[in-house]
Amino acid sequence: MFDFSIVTNWIHEMLLSVMPEGWAIFIECIAVGVCIVALYAILAIVLIYMERKVCGFFQCRLGPNRVGKWGSIQVICDVLKMLTKEIFTPKDADRFLYNLAPFMVIIASFLTFACIPFNKGAEILNFNVGVFFLLAASSIGVVGILLAGWGSNNKFSLIGAMRSGAQIISYELSVGMSIMTMVVLMGTMQFSEIVEGQADGWFIFKGHIPAVIAFIIYLIAGNAECNRGPFDLPEAESELTAGYHTEYSGMHFGFFYLAEYLNLFIVASVAATIFLGGWMPLHIIGLDGFNAVMDYIPGFIWFFAKAFFVVFLLMWIKWTFPRLRIDQILNLEWKYLVPISMVNLLLMACCVAFGFHF
């Protein structure tokens, strides 16, 4: 498996040979930022197009098919239309909070991307508390949502923001405990070590029943954290027009829309990394020839294939189940998912303590 750290170290040494270390680090940070923005733009276009096609498939229709081959340029046209729209600020809104909220939401998505390993040696931050950093950074987004509801000075926006805040804060518990269940199995919170620990088998298979339960709970709770159906009540059109982004237009609305799909991909990426081996290829013990063939497939292809598989599962859930009421959403979390997650965490601890795992 190719190690991308060889390339990054070579670039770092080359820059150090022609300039001071401070300038070299500054240029590297700029390059990383440009790469992240480019990746974000590509992911947004692909995910929105994929959502429309998957939705059309489940509803027995074609989806976008007019602009470009198979409607492939429709998303780009929508982006250009959004860029040309006026950014309108309500007269009675708190201008500072109103304008700050979209940036808070998008910054939270940027930060969570930092510790996800796309390939061996291809992660921005690789440190021993990567799981804690991920959970902490992802919780910043709820602050932006609450600021959007309050700063808009609109009762529908405020109700949507309060619903979203209660929902996200509640489901973060299940997400955290599902991830910690797998941390107990591996014994580390560093994402690169978690992936390398799955060289001889993915955790969803090595962890037995507790790993499968944690994966299912993570998918449900992760979907709820992204405010996607059937947990999209904070922006229910029939009740709250558009929820906390009712008063937003132009690229301010675009930031919220973009953050939803980026958070969807982040949830899928974390699931692929922790449960499905990340960039690690599929290996079956005893089949050396098969394992050698799998090693020829680049790691980033494995990573994105697994991530988009999880994205498809989450889209399948959204377009299959009806929207839940707010009391049903919170009952599902506090009466079912949290107790099951706690028991599952203890069960995994017992499995590790007594060696009941592969």
Swiss-Prot record:
Catalysed reaction equations from the record: a quinone + NADH + 5 H(+)(in) = a quinol + NAD(+) + 4 H(+)(out)
Keyword vocabulary terms for this entry: Cell inner membrane, Cell membrane, Membrane, NAD, Quinone, Translocase, Transmembrane, Transmembrane helix, Ubiquinone
Signal peptide location: none
E.C. number(s) listed in UniProt: 7.1.1.-
CC per GO annotation: plasma membrane
Main localisation: membrane
EC supergroup of this enzyme: translocase
One Gene Ontology MF term: quinone binding
Subcellular location: Cell inner membrane
Family: Belongs to the complex I subunit 1 family.
General function of this protein: NDH-1 shuttles electrons from NADH, via FMN and iron-sulfur (Fe-S) centers, to quinones in the respiratory chain. The immediate electron acceptor for the enzyme in this species is believed to be ubiquinone. Couples the redox reaction to proton translocation (for every two electrons transferred, four hydrogen ions are translocated across the cytoplasmic membrane), and thus conserves the redox energy in a proton gradient. This subunit may bind ubiquinone.
Full protein name: NADH-quinone oxidoreductase subunit H
